[in-house]
């Protein structure tokens, strides 16, 4: 299990995806190709818009990323749902990083707006989540607002991203 740090490299993220970071049965990132960022550049529990925590991550855009080959033929664009999933991944990572126990599941969001797209010629995607609230009861629930920028232009905004950590035997419903 890694010590709590304020940044993580790709190999660290892969260790998290293998279940080696937060302990057995606890939060994991997905393995590639569904792991949607290359590094976490900042994570803390007192920053962000609401002063309750922040996670910032980056994806280096390359024309050979897997989704460009299939979405869409002769019109490659990163699927919007993958950027949204990255934001949920980051909230789940934050919950594990902050000591929450259980397996992570995305539970929804209240609002999502797209105002641009990620194309193969882009250089870098930056993801940001600002933690609004963490509740620790039967399950651990994180609520955050987030955004995605491509080459320094914000193109997605998400409000009230919800992720829960569920211990074995706890139902989603």
Curated annotation (Swiss-Prot):
Quaternary structure, from the entry: Homodimer.
Residue positions of the active site: 71
Its job: Necessary for the introduction of cis unsaturation into fatty acids. Catalyzes the dehydration of (3R)-3-hydroxydecanoyl-ACP to E-(2)-decenoyl-ACP and then its isomerization to Z-(3)-decenoyl-ACP. Can catalyze the dehydratase reaction for beta-hydroxyacyl-ACPs with saturated chain lengths up to 16:0, being most active on intermediate chain length.
Predominant location: cytoplasm
Assigned GO CC terms: cytoplasm
EC annotation from Swiss-Prot or TrEMBL: 4.2.1.59, 5.3.3.14
Pathway: Lipid metabolism; fatty acid biosynthesis
Keywords noted in UniProt: Cytoplasm, Fatty acid biosynthesis, Fatty acid metabolism, Isomerase, Lipid biosynthesis, Lipid metabolism, Lyase
Location(s) in or outside the cell: Cytoplasm
Organism, scientific name: Bradyrhizobium diazoefficiens (strain JCM 10833 / BCRC 13528 / IAM 13628 / NBRC 14792 / USDA 110)
Protein name (database record): 3-hydroxydecanoyl-[acyl-carrier-protein] dehydratase
Domain of life, per lineage: Bacteria
Biological classification of the source: Bacteria, Pseudomonadati, Pseudomonadota, Alphaproteobacteria, Hyphomicrobiales
């Amino acid at each position: 299990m890694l010590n709590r740090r304020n940044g993580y490299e790709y190999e660290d993220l892969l260790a998290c995806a293998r279940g080696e970071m937060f302990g057995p049965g606890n939060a994991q990132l997905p393995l590639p190709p569904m792991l949607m960022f290359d590094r976490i550049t900042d994570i803390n529990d007192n920053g962000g818009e609401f002063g309750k925590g922040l996670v910032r991550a980056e994806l280096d855009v390359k024309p050979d990323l897997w989704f460009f080959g299939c979405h869409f033929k002769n019109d490659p664009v990163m699927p919007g749902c993958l950027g949204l999933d990255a934001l949920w991944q980051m909230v789940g990572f934050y919950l594990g990083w902050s000591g929450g126990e259980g397996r992570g599941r995305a539970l929804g969001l209240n609002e999502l707006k797209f105002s641009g797209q990620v194309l193969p010629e882009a250089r870098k995607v930056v993801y940001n989540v600002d933690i609004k609230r963490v509740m620790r009861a039967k399950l651990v629930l994180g609520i955050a607002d987030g955004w995605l920028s491509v080459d320094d232009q914000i193109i997605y905004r998400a409000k009230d991203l919800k992720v829960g950590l569920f211990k074995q035997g706890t139902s989603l419903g």
